[in-house]
From Swiss-Prot:
Reaction equations catalysed: dTMP + ATP = dTDP + ADP
Key words, A-Z: ATP-binding, Kinase, Nucleotide biosynthesis, Nucleotide-binding, Transferase
GO CC field: cytosol
Species of origin: Shewanella amazonensis (strain ATCC BAA-1098 / SB2B)
Name listed for the protein in its UniProt record: Thymidylate kinase
Oxidoreductase recorded as keyword: no
Amino acid sequence: MTQNPGKFIVIEGLEGAGKSSAITLVHDFIEKHTGMAPVCTREPGGTPLAEKIRDLVKNAEPGDPLCDEAECLLFYAARAQLVANVIKPSLASGRWVLGDRHNLSSIAYQGGGRGLMSLVKTISDATLGGFKPDLTLYLDIDPLLGLERAARRGALDRIEQQEIDFFHRARATFLAQARDDSSIVVIDASKPLNEVHKDILACLSTAL
């Protein structure tokens, strides 16, 4: 008997949008829906190599700032490893995969935020070849509100410390991508948490 492939669901959003609580909610929904907990991934990260890259991009060496192009390439190196060694094998075995960020983050942050859209498209095509999530939930929030929330969690990492205009550009790119791709659903993350979660569950029930 041929194994039915699993589905790949991704949670996206700016810093402070509430991804962590959304991931817990979606995890429980998938487990109830399928009878099995999903394979959970994060980007960058999710494999031994990708976790080392995560540390590099989040905590650059003092005196050796990470240039935008190197940052972009590192994200895609981590993603390629994760897709090849974890995501695709899990889906092929029938497991569902729940991702904390995926390619849309690079499109928004490196493409929109850094102005490297041409490079992002080239590397994305080369490393992913059209592979994409079945459903992406983008938690939309004003960058100022999101960063205020993130700051309350503790010290901000290198990317969270970017100038505010960077996040405005990233947000605009997230929203533009959602307008052009029906598999990306925008969730208003500025609402009270219980309302955000109701919207997420309604979306999952409709889409899946």
